């Protein structure tokens, strides 16, 4: 339970708090973290790379410099946890995803093109994950809203996390350049 008073509002939270673990502390992570804070997530950002971690400055978030897979294991993720990997570095993203997909997290996702996502799934099959565990991975991460800029991509990511959190069934058909298309390896969710 958490009790807080900011001089105007008395707030008491019962039960587990929703948390978002972001793998990577780059520009996109800043927007994702800020929006997640606005949605009242406890945000933990993990990046062992000094060039990113040293410049992290989002108030109200926790920064971890440990290896992402170690953090995911240490946090003992539960059904109120979401993990999103956005580094574009398989050495960081894949190891964290490997651990997150074995957890009861309600959402696990990774940034990347459809082709990169397909390649990631093939890499994960080489480890001790079942196909059903790998099918829990949301990738490319985010709803297909035509996002191009980091803030738009963050909106897309948090929209998908919110939909999954609320049990909304997501369609694999979306719009690209105003035309309805099916998801395949040649289309991407965002321009990253």
Tell where the protein language model's regions lie, with residue ranges.
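Segments forming oxygen-rich coordination pockets for charged ligands
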Residues: 1-48, 52-64, 73, 78-81, ...
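Residue-level detector of alpha-helix initiation sites
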Residues: 26-27, 90-91, 115
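Short amphipathic alpha-helical segments
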Residues: 33-35, 57-58, 95-98, 121-123
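Short, solvent-exposed amphipathic alpha-helical segments in soluble enzyme
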Residues: 35-40, 99-102, 125-127
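A general structural motif
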Residues: 63-70, 75, 87-91, 127
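Extended hydrophobic-aromatic, low-complexity segments
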Residues: 74, 93-96, 109-110
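ADP-ribose/adenylate-binding Rossmann-like module
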Residues: 82-87, 98-123
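Adenosine-phosphate binding glycine-rich loop
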Residues: 111-192
């Amino acid at each position: 339970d958490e009790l807080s008073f900011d001089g105007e509002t008395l707030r008491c939270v019962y039960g587990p708090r929703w948390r978002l673990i972001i793998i990577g502390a780059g520009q996109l992570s800043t927007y994702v973290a800020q929006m997640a804070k606005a949605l009242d997530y406890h945000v933990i950002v993990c990046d062992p790379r000094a060039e990113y971690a040293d410049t992290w400055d989002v108030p109200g978030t926790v920064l971890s410099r440990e290896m992402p897979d170690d953090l995911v294991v240490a946090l003992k993720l539960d059904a109120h946890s979401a993990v999103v990997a956005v580094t574009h570095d398989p050495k960081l993203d894949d190891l964290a995803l490997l651990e997150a997909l074995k957890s009861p997290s309600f959402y696990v996702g990774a940034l990347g093109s459809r082709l990169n996502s397909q390649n990631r799934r093939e890499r994960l099959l080489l480890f001790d994950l079942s196909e059903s565990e790998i099918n829990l991975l949301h990738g490319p991460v985010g709803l297909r809203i035509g996002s191009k800029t980091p803030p738009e991509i963050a909106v897309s990511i948090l929209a998908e996390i919110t939909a999954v959190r609320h049990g909304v069934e997501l369609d694999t058909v979306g719009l690209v350049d105003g035309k309805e298309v099916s998801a395949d390896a040649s289309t991407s969710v965002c321009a990253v």
